[in-house]
């Protein structure tokens, strides 16, 4: 995890994501690895533009949502996750954008493709 954190500070988001993903695979209960992976995705999203960039935040949001349950209720980690999830929600595509792309069903499967960031998530409507 220290290597992932260092790589993230050095703006090597893809390398950080790789290490965080490996740590998460070795220990799925490691909430810190999930947080680091979500942060790396958010940092890496800057390499893309427009809609592709925005959908990365769906994926990062999902990762944080799964990490949230790994921490004690009301813990500082949960509070930080909640703040970050709120920030990510503000970066989601607008409902108008989703409509124009034919993505009108919240919860429908969606494959994110933004440079080195790929993954399956679901369409999330802005509340």
PLM-predicted stretches and their roles:
Residues 17, 21-25, 52-90:
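TPR/TPR-like (Sel1-like) alpha-helical repeat modules
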Residues 1-29:
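Alpha-helical adaptor scaffolds
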Residues 5-11, 38, 43-52, 86, ...:
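Short coil/turn linking the two alpha-helices of tandem helical-hairpin repeats
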Residues 1-2, 32-36, 80-83:
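Alpha-solenoid helical repeat scaffolds
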Residues 90-127:
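N-terminal alpha-helical interaction modules that lie
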């Amino acid at each position: 995890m220290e290597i992932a954190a260092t790589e993230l500070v050095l703006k090597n988001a893809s390398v950080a994501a790789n290490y965080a993903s490996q740590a998460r695979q070795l220990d799925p209960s490691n909430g810190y690895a999930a947080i680091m992976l979500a942060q790396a995705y958010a940092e890496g999203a800057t390499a893309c533009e427009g809609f592709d960039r925005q959908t990365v935040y769906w994926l990062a949001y999902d990762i944080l949502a799964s990490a949230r349950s790994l921490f004690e209720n009301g813990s500082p980690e949960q509070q930080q996750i909640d703040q970050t999830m709120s920030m990510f929600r503000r970066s989601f595509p607008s409902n108008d954008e989703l409509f124009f792309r034919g993505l009108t069903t919240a919860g429908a499967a969606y494959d994110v493709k933004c440079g080195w960031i790929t993954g399956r998530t679901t369409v999330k409507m802005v509340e």
